[in-house]
Amino acid sequence: MFQPILPCVFRGIIEGERYPVVMSTYLGVMGRVLLQNTSFFSSLLNEMAHKFNQEMDQLLGNMIEMWVDRMDNITQPEGRKLSALALLSLLPSDNSVIQDKFCGIINISVEGLHYVMTEDPETGTYKDCMLISHLEEPKVTEDEEPPTEQDKRKKMLALKDPVHAVSLQQFIYEKLKAQQELLGEQGFQSLMETVDTEIVTQLQEFLQGF
């Protein structure tokens, strides 16, 4: 349905769309494409590389850079988490361009964790507050209406949405583990050294228990 407008969306991101609300929308659309249809994203990247007369890797690097740079345009926690999931989906990779942007991807991921994680005061562990469980039934007080069919449909849709179905914490852990296995311990450590030590410390706190 959105296919005809995607080149325009891609161009808007690369050229740094100046209106924050529009840029936020563009990044949200591209995040969903990247996360949920990788093969289509690859063909779009190939098409845009021809239009921009650039190598695909170079264009991908430019897109990630602009994404990281304009992350503050995204004000909703859902959008922050979507961006983190989308960029993390590029890992594991031995592509030098993606490795070059690894620091930015981790920065966005940790920012995303700050937006969506809540601490359990009893256990001191963190959990992703955006996750919706199949089993969870909202508690209805006497003053509230029970959920309507539309509410139930909304929940079923939400359960198919990675933002509500995938734990950002778990996703980061699995992607970093896969990257470590791909590069080996030494290569992975070199990559982690490109990330600010404060960000690494925050990441370790969020991933306690994994």
Functional labels for PLM-detected ranges:
Residues 1-210:
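Alpha-solenoid helical-repeat scaffold
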